[in-house]
């Protein structure tokens, strides 16, 4: 069964940004969009939509990525003829959950969306477009991966295949809803162009399990935390998409539960020293990426009344507690030194960004980057080598999910 979810902590006053108005200070005017209108691209780009400007993504290390895997190995792992001990009953129970489709009628828009978008002006409007764009890209990435897994596993394990197909349904629904949101701002992501043009990152199946489990669970905690914060502080409810996060996050949670079941079905991914090292590596990768990403976009979180770093640490801690129920080892993220290391990484990353924005030639820029990259790697390695927390359970004790809204 899925791991029992820890209760989210009440949002404390320090969690909320004390600024009650969104000022147009100079730091907001320098924010750069990670997408550019198609009209600025080469002639190979897709024609602009009649409804608005199509957008394509500029790649950076922190951009949401598209993943692929060894589908042949995945077929072997879940082949019911080869692996007689697979816990098919758990997969069948999960399948019924997905078939119920709790959110089938949830993602219905109303006139509030366009009205809110029209009221949003200045830097906050620009930042919000970027938020929708990045979120849509991440959801669409999940759709493509799950769809292909559903197709490839049909013959070897129809139950697992159908769950992947139903998860791709959820991700497509999320991506479409977010893209509709972009249309409120007179933009749209060209998802067909993205499918063909984006670079795909290859991960072996066990790494897909680690990374995707963390991605889904951290998504749950991000969405539910934002939802609860805005429910308590409605004056920051600048766009109605946040009102959908309570039900939306349960899709993320169910997806994470499924990946938990997949890992339990392959105990070799969880019960040796190598699994402990990889588990810590993926925890650190996901947490650092989120922290650096969000600290580049503090204006967005300030715009909805959140303190970016407090919000991120809250999400990291809750995700880590949840992850500890399945991963054999996790990071000690509640050690104050862990946050200090993250904050030092933010400072180094800001310096790296500043180097990239100078007018120096590429050789000079690269020379300036070398000591900064070395310092960043040193901080990441030091965080990885902090004493971990032994966790998980090799006998996979079953936990009943207890979700509190």
UniProtKB/Swiss-Prot annotation:
Q: Please state the pathway this protein functions in, per its UniProt record.
A: Porphyrin-containing compound metabolism; chlorophyll biosynthesis
The keyword Plastid is annotated on this UniProt entry = yes
The catalytic activity, as recorded, is: Mg-protoporphyrin IX 13-monomethyl ester + 3 NADPH + 3 O2 + 2 H(+) = 3,8-divinyl protochlorophyllide a + 3 NADP(+) + 5 H2O
User: Which of UniProt's keywords are assigned here?
Assistant: Chlorophyll biosynthesis, Chloroplast, Iron, Metal-binding, NADP, Oxidoreductase, Photosynthesis, Plastid, Transit peptide
UniProt GO molecular function = magnesium-protoporphyrin IX monomethyl ester (oxidative) cyclase activity; metal ion binding
Tell me the cofactors it needs: Fe cation
Q: What is its main location?
A: plastid
Q: Where is this region: Disordered?
A: 33-54
Query: Could you say which EC number(s) this protein's record lists?
Result: 1.14.13.81
GO biological process terms on file: chlorophyll biosynthetic process; photosynthesis
Query: Where does it reside?
Result: Plastid, Chloroplast
Q: Which cellular component appears as one GO term in the record?
A: chloroplast thylakoid membrane
Q: Where is the composition biased (Low complexity)?
A: 33-47
Q: Where is the transit peptide?
A: 1-44
**Role of this protein:** Catalyzes the formation of the isocyclic ring in chlorophyll biosynthesis. Mediates the cyclase reaction, which results in the formation of divinylprotochlorophyllide (Pchlide) characteristic of all chlorophylls from magnesium-protoporphyrin IX 13-monomethyl ester (MgPMME).
Kindly provide the name given to this protein in its UniProt entry: Magnesium-protoporphyrin IX monomethyl ester [oxidative] cyclase, chloroplastic
Q: Which organism is it from?
A: Euphorbia esula (Leafy spurge)
- What high-level taxonomic lineage is stated for the organism? Eukaryota, Viridiplantae, Streptophyta, Embryophyta, Tracheophyta
Its gene name is CRD1
């Amino acid at each position: 069964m899925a791991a029992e979810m820890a209760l989210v902590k009440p949002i404390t006053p320090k969690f909320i940004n004390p600024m009650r108005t969104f000022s147009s200070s100079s730091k907001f005017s320098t924010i750069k969009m990670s997408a550019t209108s198609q009209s600025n691209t080469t002639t190979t780009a897709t024609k602009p939509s009649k409804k608005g400007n199509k957008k394509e993504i500029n790649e950076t290390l922190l951009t949401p990525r598209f993943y692929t895997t060894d589908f042949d190995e995945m077929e072997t792992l879940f082949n019911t003829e080869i692996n007689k001990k697979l816990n098919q009953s758990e997969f069948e129970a999960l399948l019924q959950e997905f078939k119920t489709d709790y959110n089938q009628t949830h993602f219905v828009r109303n006139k509030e969306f366009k009205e809110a978008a029209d009221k949003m002006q200045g830097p906050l409007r620009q930042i919000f477009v970027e938020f929708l764009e990045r979120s849509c890209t991440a959801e669409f990435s999940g759709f493509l991966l799950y769809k292909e897994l559903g197709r490839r596993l049909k013959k070897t394990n129809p139950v697992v295949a159908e769950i992947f197909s139903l998860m791709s349904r959820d991700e497509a629904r999320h991506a479409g809803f977010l893209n509709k949101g972009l249309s409120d701002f007179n933009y749209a992501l060209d998802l067909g162009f993205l499918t063909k043009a984006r670079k795909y990152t290859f991960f072996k199946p066990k790494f897909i399990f680690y990374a995707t489990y963390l991605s889904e669970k951290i998504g749950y905690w991000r969405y539910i935390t934002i939802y609860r914060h805005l429910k308590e502080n409605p004056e920051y409810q600048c766009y109605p998409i946040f009102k959908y996060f309570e039900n939306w996050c349960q899709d993320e949670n169910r997806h994470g539960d499924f990946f938990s079941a997949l890992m339990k079905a392959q105990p070799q991914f969880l019960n040796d020293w190598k699994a402990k090292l990889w588990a810590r590596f993926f925890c650190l990768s996901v947490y650092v990426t989120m922290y650096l990403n969000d600290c580049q976009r503090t204006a967005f979180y300030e715009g909805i009344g959140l303190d970016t770093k407090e919000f991120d640490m809250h999400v990291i801690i809750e995700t880590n507690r949840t992850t500890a129920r399945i991963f054999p080892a996790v990071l000690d993220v509640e050690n104050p030194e862990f946050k200090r290391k993250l904050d030092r990484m933010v400072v180094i990353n800001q310096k790296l960004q500043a180097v990239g924005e100078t007018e120096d030639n590429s050789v000079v820029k690269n020379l300036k980057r070398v000591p900064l990259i070395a310092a960043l790697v040193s901080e990441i390695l030091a965080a990885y080598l902090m004493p971990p927390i032994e966790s998980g359970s090799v006998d996979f004790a079953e936990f009943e999910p207890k979700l509190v809204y």
